[in-house]
């Protein structure tokens, strides 16, 4: 076992989702500077769902042309695209084009789509590559995958968020009774500790580190000794379920693992059943309904309205909610790694609890730009704490479901991945028209919005 290989596996895992996770925690600084404004989170949610064309293509290739697609050229391609896209974002994220009904952040949205394709495709290519190494390096890879959310969140906390200053400006309003002068306030944002450009360059550097780690995992002589024999790799690649996922500290994301069903033999068909049969059909339906529900909430519904629920309380509240909730996800994984309670009752209680906190978030978003306690520091503290508890509780639920379904066999994990994507897709499709078409949620101005 090589420490050098462990470090490379960890750095490789960090590159899996660092770009999109970084985009989410940087939104508090981006939404105030682009034409889409508060609508950007809902756009980003639907973009990520569209990016599933990447893993869909890889999955279909593995399903209908098994053994034809080598994941290594795909990984080189997507990581290189990630490096270039994040680098371009650093210089183009503010650039707009005028078309249709006004200005749009074409560069930001198109590059975000590329990054979404990169990260979504990593879910079905990085792990098959790790199967080429000895099994003990899987644990380190999953630690890196968990850090892909934690590292950009910590950097964003250091970055901070610009303080809002309101400056007087005069505006003339012409009425039928005469010319009346009224005082308006202009919003000015003080720069953060370092710029959004610097943050995207950091993400580009992280993707370059991932690319370098991948190169060394393929080419370094010390790592070559850690590779399995070709026969062992081929056998494992045809039996993805043989990986011991119980070693993973990041069990909350079974949807990020390749769960491909290759009906090539009786042994595989047998393993594709729901394993131990520990749970009744009703209990399994309950588990999958909960899985779809929590993924709809955490991956689409609530992230789409995060700006509406937090920005009325100020940029600082939005910044803390975005970053601390990103930290809450790996914290939930860490807790579940040591306390993996497979209780359906606990799962139900945590789901109801998380949904309750989610309902509070949705209510504050619906009341935007004048939610409860808008003029009180308690309101800002409550919305940040609510976001953290919401993510923490439902992330733990996803971990428990992943553990349960992993024990039930390969077929259960296949259904797990499908239900996760279905829940996320339904959540995104339901929220996008409400936010972007019917405009049921209202944005505000930090200086001129007057609330009772």
Swiss-Prot record:
Q: Which InterPro entries match?
A: Riboflavin_transptr (IPR009357)
Gene Ontology biological process: riboflavin transport
Q: Where are the transmembrane segments?
A: 11-31, 38-58, 73-93, 111-131, 138-158, 199-219, 285-305, 321-341, 344-364, 381-401, 412-432
May I ask which residue range the UniProt record assigns to the signal sequence? none
Membrane disposition:
Multi-pass membrane protein
Mainly resides where?
membrane
Give the GO molecular function terms.
Answer: riboflavin transmembrane transporter activity
Glycosylation is annotated at: 168, 174, 179, 193
Its cellular-component GO annotations read: plasma membrane
The similarity annotation says:
Belongs to the riboflavin transporter family.
Q: What does this protein do?
A: Plasma membrane transporter mediating the uptake by cells of the water soluble vitamin B2/riboflavin that plays a key role in biochemical oxidation-reduction reactions of the carbohydrate, lipid, and amino acid metabolism.
The name under which this protein is listed is Solute carrier family 52, riboflavin transporter, member 3-B
The record lists the organism as: Danio rerio (Zebrafish)
């Amino acid at each position: 076992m090589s420490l050098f290989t462990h470090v490379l596996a960890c750095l490789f895992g960090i590159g899996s989702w660092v770009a999109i996770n970084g985009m989410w925690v940087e939104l508090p600084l981006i939404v105030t500077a682009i034409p889409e404004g508060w609508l950007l989170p809902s756009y980003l949610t639907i973009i990520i769902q569209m990016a599933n064309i990447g893993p869909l293509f890889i999955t279909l290739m593995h399903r209908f042309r098994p053994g034809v697609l080598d994941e290594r050229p795909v990984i080189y391609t997507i990581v290189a695209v990630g490096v270039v896209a994040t680098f371009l974002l650093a210089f183009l994220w503010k650039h707009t084009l005028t078309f249709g009904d006004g200005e749009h952040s074409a560069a930001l949205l198109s590059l975000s789509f590329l990054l979404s394709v990169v990260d979504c495709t990593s879910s079905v290519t990085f792990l098959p590559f790790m199967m080429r190494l000895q099994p003990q390096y899987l644990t380190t890879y999953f630690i890196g995958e968990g850090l892909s959310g934690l590292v950009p969140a910590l950097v964003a906390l250091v970055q901070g968020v610009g303080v809002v200053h309101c400056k007087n400006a005069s505006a003339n309003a012409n009425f039928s009774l005469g010319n009346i002068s009224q005082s308006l306030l202009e919003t000015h944002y003080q720069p953060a500790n370092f710029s959004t450009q610097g943050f995207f360059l950091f993400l580009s550097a992280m993707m370059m580190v991932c690319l370098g780690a991948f190169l060394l995992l393929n080419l370094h002589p010390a790592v070559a000794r850690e590779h399995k024999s070709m026969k062992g790799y081929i056998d494992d690649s045809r039996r993805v379920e043989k990986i011991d996922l119980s070693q993973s500290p990041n069990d909350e994301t079974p949807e990020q693992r390749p769960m491909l069903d290759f009906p090539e033999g009786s042994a595989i068909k047998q393993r594709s059943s729901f394993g131990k049969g520990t749970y009744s059909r009703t209990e399994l339906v309950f588990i999958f309904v909960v899985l779809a529900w929590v993924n709809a909430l955490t991956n689409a519904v609530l992230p789409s309205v995060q700006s509406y629920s937090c920005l009325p309380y100020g940029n600082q509240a939005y910044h803390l909610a975005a970053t601390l909730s990103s930290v809450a996800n790996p914290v939930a994984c860490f807790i579940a790694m040591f306390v993996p309670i497979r209780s359906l009752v606990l799962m139900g209680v945590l789901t109801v609890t998380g949904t309750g906190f989610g309902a509070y978030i949705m209510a504050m978003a619906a009341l935007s730009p004048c939610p409860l306690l808008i003029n009180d520091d308690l309101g800002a503290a409550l919305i940040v704490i609510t976001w953290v508890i919401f993510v923490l509780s439902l992330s733990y639920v996803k971990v428990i479901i992943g553990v349960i379904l992993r024990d039930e066999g390969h077929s259960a994990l296949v259904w797990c991945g499908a239900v996760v994507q279905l829940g996320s897709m339904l959540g995104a499709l339901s929220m996008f028209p409400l936010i972007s078409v019917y405009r049921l949620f209202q944005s505000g101005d930090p200086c001129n919005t007057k609330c009772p």
